[in-house]
Amino acid sequence: MVVQGTVKPHASFNSREDAETLRKAMKGIGTDEKSITHILATRSNAQRQQIKTDYTTLFGKHLEDELKSELSGNYEAAALALLRKPDEFLAEQLHAAMKGLGTDENALIDILCTQSNAQIHAIKAAFKLLYKEDLEKEIISETSGNFQRLLVSMLQGGRKEDEPVNAAHAAEDAAAIYQAGEGQIGTDESRFNAVLATRSYPQLHQIFHEYSKISNKTILQAIENEFSGDIKNGLLAIVKSVENRFAYFAERLHHAMKGLGTSDKTLIRILVSRSEIDLANIKETFQAMYGKSLYEFIADDCSGDYKDLLLQITGH
């Protein structure tokens, strides 16, 4: 299977021309949102970084500041998200999830429970650079208990990603987490944590297979029964992204748009952060899971320039 995003480098890219087009779109009375949307959604992140540099060189102003003064609401948030480097964007999202009153635990889970080791280390470095704070310390001060321990485990970026599948070890781990959960009264969360945070994805696949052989439940059902609250959601996120990452993000997008109201933060975060990785696959999986395209959901749920920008990010 080909894993691909919906946003690719623009073939006849000219960053100076794009910078000039953006300047023209914001000069004088009114704003040409169509031009802004087209450029931001059809250039790769690396190309957008070049446009930012050229914009400042040509006009002595920062593109983000100009956009902030011209745009507003969710359209502004999505446009600025596209201008951030991927690791900076996710570091900002983590910071926003923790600042002020209350913590957005779902954002912490979406970001920290689905990344590779390299991505985790890049996000931690970006966080330090942007906020002069240690991400792990911030997480510890904003979360507690088993959920905190799970996130701290994920923040180590210590998954054995190259570990080959070993059926005997998988059977041992499956037995250990069975004993830590279903096999006893009460739950030993640390055992689940140790296995889910460190084993490679292929090895975890094998562990889940072995688990269903010794239990009459799948690993997902066991977690649903044994845990509650944020720790449950965190463990489920890891298992779901091991089993089918595209389905995990399709489900999160659907959840952001179904029913009354829209979680625009979730929508922007997932569409922007997955746009060059696997958004094409997520789109396809979304259609298969919900019998309605991601395009239709966004078109029904969002409006105006914001809607147009999201639709262009998804390749429409």
From Swiss-Prot:
One GO cellular component, as annotated: cytoplasm
Alphabetized UniProt keyword annotations: Annexin, Calcium, Calcium/phospholipid-binding, Phosphoprotein, Repeat
Cleaved signal peptide residues: none
UniProt-listed SMART domains: ANX
Keyword Repeat: yes
Protein modification: Phosphorylated in vitro on serine(s) and threonine(s) by PKC.
GO molecular function: calcium ion binding; calcium-dependent phospholipid binding; phosphatidylserine binding
InterPro entries xref list: Annexin, Annexin_repeat, Annexin_repeat_CS, Annexin_sf
UniProt superkingdom: Eukaryota
Record-listed Phosphothreonine modification sites: T6
Annexin repeats: 13-84, 85-156, 168-240, 244-315
Gene3D superfamilies: Annexin
Quaternary structure (record): Homohexamer.
Protein family per UniProt: Belongs to the annexin family.
Domain notes: A pair of annexin repeats may form one binding site for calcium and phospholipid.
Name of the featured protein: Annexin-B12
